[in-house]
């Protein structure tokens, strides 16, 4: 376990006594991203992929799974992995993808099956239950699109500038 913690510290991931890490080997965190103390990340039977230069405020929660609650005669804790499959697809465990350059405010919750498009902003306290395109500003419970960060013309310029800066490194 010490080796896991050392590897995390070197990547800018700071686990503390409240860092949930079930299935931590399913966590992918790209360069320039740090995960703050007090984070809760549960990778069930699906990965959590966090892109480059993602910024988190305090206490984010990311959960790639859910519980099946519709089986009669069973406690939720007794549901098997096989019972999470519907027509051959696990609909209760789905990846979370946070693309490059996203900023998540304090106390954000991101749930299974969500992709947050690159360079988006997630307002503090948001509960994200569906995917959003790049350059979105989202917030609320459940999170909704507030507006786009830039106009189409500004997005093209920004993409070009980001591409140029990536090549100059």
Across the structure, where does each feature detected by a protein language model lie?
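Acidic/histidine-enriched, glycine/proline-rich intrinsically disordered or flexible terminal extensions
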Residues: 155-169
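Hydrophobic transmembrane signal anchors and adjacent membrane-proximal interface regions, especially
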Residues: 3, 99-102, 122, 166
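C-terminal/domain-terminus segments
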Residues: 8, 31, 109-146, 150-158
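Flexible, glycine/small-residue-enriched loop-and-beta-strand segment within the central core
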Residues: 17-29, 35-112, 141, 149-150
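Extended, small-residue-rich solenoid/repeat segments and analogous flexible loops
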Residues: 1-24, 169
């Amino acid at each position: 376990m010490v080796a896991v913690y050392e590897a995390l510290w070197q990547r800018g991931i700071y686990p503390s006594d409240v860092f949930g890490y079930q299935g931590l080997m399913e966590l992918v965190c790209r360069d320039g991203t740090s995960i703050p103390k007090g984070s809760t990340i549960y990778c069930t039977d699906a990965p959590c992929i966090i892109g480059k230069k993602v910024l988190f405020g305090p206490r984010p929660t990311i959960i790639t799974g859910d519980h099946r609650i519709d089986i009669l005669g069973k406690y939720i804790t007794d549901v098997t992995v096989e019972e999470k499959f519907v027509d051959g697809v696990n609909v209760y465990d789905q990846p979370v993808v946070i693309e490059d350059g996203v900023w998540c405010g304090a106390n954000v919750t991101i749930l299974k099956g969500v992709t947050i498009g690159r360079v988006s902003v997630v307002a503090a306290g948001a509960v994200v239950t569906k995917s959003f395109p790049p350059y979105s500003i989202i917030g609320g419970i459940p999170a909704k699109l507030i507006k786009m960060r830039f106009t189409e013309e500004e997005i093209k310029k920004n993409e070009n500038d980001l591409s140029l800066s990536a090549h100059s490194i």
